[in-house]
UniProtKB/Swiss-Prot annotation:
InterPro entries: Heat_shock_Hsp33 (IPR000397), Heat_shock_Hsp33_C (IPR016154), Heat_shock_Hsp33_N (IPR016153). CDD domains: Hsp33. One of its GO terms (molecular function) is protein folding chaperone. Under oxidizing conditions two disulfide bonds are formed involving the reactive cysteines. Under reducing conditions zinc is bound to the reactive cysteines and the protein is inactive. HAMAP family: HslO. Belongs to the HSP33 family. Disulfide bonds join 262-264, 295-298. Keywords: Chaperone, Cytoplasm, Disulfide bond, Redox-active center, Zinc. PANTHER family: 33 KDA CHAPERONIN (PTHR30111:SF1). GO terms for biological process: protein refolding. This is 33 kDa chaperonin.
Length: 320
């Protein structure tokens, strides 16, 4: 399920921007249970993380919404991992012009991501929405890699359902992990900034009656205006109260910080250069007078000077 509101309606987001400031809520994640513990809930605000991705990659409107949804989805999945160093990798590879969507998120609340064609823009749908499904493509696969921190990651894949991201994540959870789930993802933006972004994941606990599945979906439908509500200043707790307040909602006190973060650094780039071999580095010194590398996940540019390359070659010669 995806936010069917102003998050994809450009006219409406402009109207909102004239009367209200963007959400000032810091990015965070909370957990809860409902229906006497039979439903587990994760909710998050990812506004600043998505805005940073938009700025770093110079994303178009539709690319911002697509990547923003995927970033929130990966964070929701990572929230249920057990070890702090555990991570989730999402890859959505459809037949649309956006190309692939790649996201890496950790149980620690860090997230990064990129799309293959960040500048792509498409006409709005007849309902004046950004056409994320058309941009991603309705034919292709969602790949989910889970690294639980034990050195043996495992991957599963399902066919895309709609390319809208939320539907595809729900289908993955129900078919691959066999956990009945309802997912709501939203990104609200205007020409200047991401006004609000986030998501909610509801899942049945083991042993819970199947009759709660339509109940979960109906409850999430109450907050289809999810991202505009965040843009207006509503908090996650208030939003969860709207859809689950009368169903024995219990919100955990822990609040986890969410942030865009990439592990790349100059030392890693130099390590990758060493893998090219001494002869290749000598050729770089002669022809390019240095080296340049760009991290795909965060678009950070690393420039390695000629002197630094010579130092690397000298180290390799001294320690063959």
């Amino acid at each position: 399920m995806t936010d069917a509101s102003g998050s994809e309606r450009l006219k409406r987001t402009k109207d909102i921007s004239e009367s209200t400031p963007p959400s000032s809520l810091p990015d965070h994640l909370i957990r809860a249970t409902a229906a006497e513990g039979k439903i587990r809930v994760v909710g998050l605000v990812s506004t600043q993380a998505v805005q940073e991705a938009r700025e770093r990659h110079k994303l178009s409107y539709v690319a911002t919404v697509a990547l923003g949804r995927a970033m929130s989805a990966a964070l929701l999945l990572a929230a249920n991992l057990k070890r702090r160093q555990a991570r989730i990798n999402l890859q959505l590879k459809g037949n649309g012009p956006l190309g692939g969507i790649y996201v890496d998120a950790g149980m620690d609340g860090t997230v990064r991501g990129y799309v293959s064609n960040p500048a792509i823009e498409l006409p709005l749908t007849p309902e004046s929405k950004l056409d994320v499904g058309q941009a991603v493509g309705r034919y292709g696969y969602l790949h989910v890699l889970r690294d639980l921190g034990y050195g043996q990651p495992y991957t599963s894949a399902v066919e895309l359902v709609s390319g809208e991201v939320g539907d595809d994540i729900s289908y993955y959870l129900s078919s691959s992990e066999q956990i009945p789930s309802a997912v709501l993802l939203g990104v609200n933006l205007d020409s200047q900034r991401v006004r609000a972004a986030g998501g909610v994941l509801m899942q049945l606990m083991p042993g819970a009656p199947a009759s709660l599945i339509p109940e979960m979906e109906a409850r999430l439908a109450k907050v289809e205006e999810f991202s505009p509500m965040l843009a207006y200043g509503g908090g996650l707790r208030e939003l969860l109260q709207i859809c689950l307040g009368d169903l024995d909602l219990k919100i955990a006190p822990e609040v986890r910080t969410i942030r865009f973060y990439c592990q790349c650094n100059s030392d890693r780039v130099k390590g990758a250069l060493r893998m090219l071999g001494r002869d290749e580095l000598i050729d770089m010194i002669r022809t390019d007078k240095g080296a340049e590398a760009v991290c795909q996940f965060c678009n950070e540019v690393y420039r390695i000077s000629e002197d630094e390359l010579r130092s690397i070659v000298a180290e390799m010669s001294a320690n063959p």
